[in-house]
Amino acid sequence: MAENSLLGKLDGLVSRFEEVGTLITDPAVIADMKRFVKLNKEYRDLEKIVGARSEYVKVLNGIEEAKALLESEQDPEMREMAREELDTCNERIPALEEEIKLLLVPADPQDDKNAIVEIRGGTGGDEAALFAGDLYRMYVKYCELKGWKISVSSFSEGSSGGFKEIIFTVSGEKVYGTLKYESGVHRVQRVPATETQGRVHTSAATVAVLPEADEFDVEINEGEIKWDTFRSGGAGGQNVNKVESGVRLRYVWKNPITGVSEEILIECTETRDQPKNKERALTRLRSFIYDKEHQKYLDDIASKRKTMVSTGDRSAKIRTYNYPQGRITDHRINYTIYNLSAFMDGEIQDCLDHLIVAENAERLKESEL
């Protein structure tokens, strides 16, 4: 086989793949959970690259064999078969090379994590809260389509419905890597139910998507956490307002980016079981701190890119939902969909796919492979 620069980049990774495969069966490594999880993720990532390399080598060999057959074979039928094989293999090469190049570009290390999603009504008062509720229902339906699990941590209802704020966790495969594109300001243009003149109003809601931190991702001195309990409201029953199942934690933490100490306040009324609420409040605390550290990673990426798809900038207007025209426009990629009702029913994958393609193009361009 002729010298191939792309294969040269992969040779060392094959050796590392074999090394990691041995390490994750070592009892000493298995006993070190933090190291084991890290190596397991590296193994899965390398497995994809090694698999793509094997297919690439197979196609390159097919090209060499077809060329050799054309040079040596006199039978017309055999020569025609060789030409067809050569054409087929040559057609596959560009896609395989792009796949390998993309796999070689470091992805966001948090993509495989679960996500904590926060939706807050912004400008627009009651209408903004109603729109925040619409976004929540949209994500619920999308998660149902994906087979993901949603667990609401806390919420504050709007006076006319919807939510002033709702925070929930989404669990499943590559949740953060998919939902991270939803971070930002979502703007809605429609006639509110309370509008008597039929005028179109503009409101907004903010979505923040955080990677859920694992226990060993962040070091927290649990002895410094101040806990309070309170009676949580609910739909009814004997437990309501009689058992202090709601929990509130306060934790003083030094922000590594600003260097300033700040108090983090988190409440959880997710279940009627106080220990479970404590556990989930701790998870949110870890995720909050982890997100701040992850934001530095995103800022570093943003400083290197001229165009950005998923920078994590939660103040950027990312999408407009225009009800009179039945359209949604994603401003990051200037992509418009004319099926708003289906979109609000959770059919958002097409838009996400376009965002993923745009970001992959950015990653390939900046990698200079």
Swiss-Prot record:
Modified sites of kind N5-methylglutamine: 238
InterPro entries reported in the protein's UniProt record: PCRF, Pep_chain_release_fac_I, Pep_chain_release_fac_I_sf, Prokaryotic/Mito_RF, RF-1
SMART domains the UniProt entry points to: PCRF (SM00937)
Post-translation changes: Methylated by PrmC. Methylation increases the termination efficiency of RF1.
Keyword set, alphabetical order: Cytoplasm, Methylation, Protein biosynthesis
Pfam assignment, any one: PCRF
Keyword check for Membrane: no
Annotated GO CC locations: cytoplasm
Known function: Peptide chain release factor 1 directs the termination of translation in response to the peptide chain termination codons UAG and UAA.
NCBIfam families named in the record: prfA (TIGR00019), PRK00591.1 (NF001859)
Protein name: Peptide chain release factor 1
Phylogenetic classification of the source organism: Bacteria, Pseudomonadati, Bacteroidota, Bacteroidia, Bacteroidales
Name of encoding gene: prfA
